[in-house]
């Protein structure tokens, strides 16, 4: 993509996602993702209805009048995006690819976090950590993340989600809010996710949510006869007879088994998640995720 085309795309997505983050997600995001807790703000005279547990007895005794401590929510958080940039993200059977969708979802999350005065960072991964952008504030910083979301070129096409989760655990010491944006195509021959151990540790240390980005053709095959399919991560190719009901049913069963295993793993470690497809309205998916928390 030329620099001119990239700038146009960045600007287009910025306008769209910034508007969404202001008009739709601001309140939902604030409610869903809390700050680190309550911080002391000031002492003032007691008013009817104040919680007596917040009485400041030292000041009360000194001034011979009831005073209470006032606390405010520590709103500022660190938000990390863990972005899967492996080869499978280039697939899309409709107007946009999974990488296109990931860029928009990542942008909405970034601008929503920024609107709440949170720092935002990003980690781009394949089967290794390809790039780490430490969390910061500011429009120029957000636009840098957005450019990478749109146009980052990884060195590897393969996937290892555990690498990203381990890096998050080791690099971000304080508890943060983290979003894993991936198609989650990282499983064993028994169709179980390879990243369970790393997920368990990361979810115990950070507030982790998973956004499963997928295309409908990865879950069901169309009935269109012979179809050549390729693995974007290995380069392997094969022909499939999609006119065969048995082939289509076996493929759907395989896909469902993988998704069930992923959902069970996420529930096991109390990780919130959303499934968002390239042909659906991601706004609804994100709002559902926020409201479920």
Q: Where do the protein language model's features map onto the residues?
A:
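A conditional alpha-helix N-cap/helix-loop micro-motif detector
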Residues: 103, 157-161, 191-192, 255
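Well-ordered alpha-helical segments embedded in enzymatic catalytic cores
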Residues: 105, 163-167, 258
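Short amphipathic alpha-helical interaction patches enriched in hydrophobic/aromatic residues
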Residues: 89, 93, 149-153, 270-273
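Von Willebrand factor
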Residues: 141-176, 189, 215-216
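A generic local structural motif
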Residues: 66-68, 164-167, 195-197
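An amphipathic, basic-hydrophobic helix/alpha-beta surface used to engage anionic
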Residues: 1-137, 177, 181-182, 189, ...
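Short, electropositive alpha-helical surface patch
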Residues: 133-147, 291-292
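Von Willebrand factor type A / integrin I
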Residues: 1-33, 42, 51, 170-174, ...
